[in-house]
Amino acid sequence: EEGKLRKSFRTSVLKGLKNGVSPESPDCLNFTRNYQPTVDAAYLAQAFLRAPKALWEPLDTLTKQRYVTAFKSLRRNKPVYNNHLLFAAIIETFLLKVGEQVDQAKVFLACKKIEEWYVGDGWYSDGPSFSMDYYNDYVIHPMLVDIYQVLKEKKIVSERQYNTAVKRMIRHSD
């Protein structure tokens, strides 16, 4: 029973992903109006990074190219100077992972600023001033670790940098 549900869900998700970038579909996602698409695309790119065999690889070539084009179109958006730097960076990291041209400045700026904003004990400030909020939990730690994992695989950052991010995330979760 559970296997049948899983198969049904996977089929629905893949259909939804295809519809998300099909111009003729009423489910086509917004990648052009205001800044919100960058936030939404960041979580989609992170899902593709975390589950490539389930979410990215099964997509047909046209759908993949449409996502790449949509993600690249978001480069026009300037991120807010806080955890939003990671949204642009994770999109670029996904593009790196799939062999596309990358705006390295977005990735390096995000990593540099987040590292500068580390305040200790597993906490990062969300921009230049510290605020104790939930962004450490579901943006900063998971995205930074996922970015560093790909950069480590590509030999762009050291194992030490990746391990430090993982240790800080573990400390934050304690």
Regions found by a protein language model. Name each.
Residues 6-169, 174:
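Aromatic-lined, polymer-binding surfaces characteristic
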